[in-house]
Amino acid sequence: MAIVIVAFVVFLDQFTKYLAAKYLMPIGSYPVIKHFFHLTYVENRGAAFGMLQNKTLFFIVITVVVGIVLIYSMIKLPENSLYNYTLAMILGGAIGNLIDRVRLGYVVDFIDFKFFPAVFNVADSFIVVGAIILGYLMIFKGGIR
């Protein structure tokens, strides 16, 4: 099941980025709910909040190392554990952004909540939600088993 989650996250991420590039790049931004939620095309050459701009090789190396650690952890965990599914969400997001960095030299972002200081993408969402769930499990459910 974990491999299905990884594949789903990568597919959803890459498909939505394709749509963003095709439809948003020419117009820049589309207000879905004016002053609250926009779809805004951004080529992110750094990390969150614009940190470490133009460090593509650095991000590729870090992502590969983290990916290896995630895969190793997933192999060691029971196949059907919530921990495994959570790591699969994070791995899928990491792979989605890695594909962009290798293929394009930047990550396509497009989800733009006007009250939040950064534009992000589906991969980022799965990484953050996966990390929050993992943190919860580790703190309140007694660590990784």
UniProtKB/Swiss-Prot annotation:
One of its GO terms (biological process) is proteolysis. The keyword Cytoplasm does not apply. Pathway: Protein modification; lipoprotein biosynthesis (signal peptide cleavage). One of its GO terms (molecular function) is aspartic-type endopeptidase activity. Its EC number is 3.4.23.36. Keywords: Aspartyl protease, Cell membrane, Hydrolase, Membrane, Protease, Transmembrane, Transmembrane helix. The keyword Membrane applies. The active site is at D109, D124. It catalyses: Release of signal peptides from bacterial membrane prolipoproteins. Hydrolyzes -Xaa-Yaa-Zaa-|-(S,diacylglyceryl)Cys-, in which Xaa is hydrophobic (preferably Leu), and Yaa (Ala or Ser) and Zaa (Gly or Ala) have small, neutral side chains. Pfam families: Peptidase_A8. GO terms for cellular component: plasma membrane. Belongs to the peptidase A8 family. PANTHER family: LIPOPROTEIN SIGNAL PEPTIDASE. This is Lipoprotein signal peptidase. It comes from Caldanaerobacter subterraneus subsp. tengcongensis (strain DSM 15242 / JCM 11007 / NBRC 100824 / MB4).
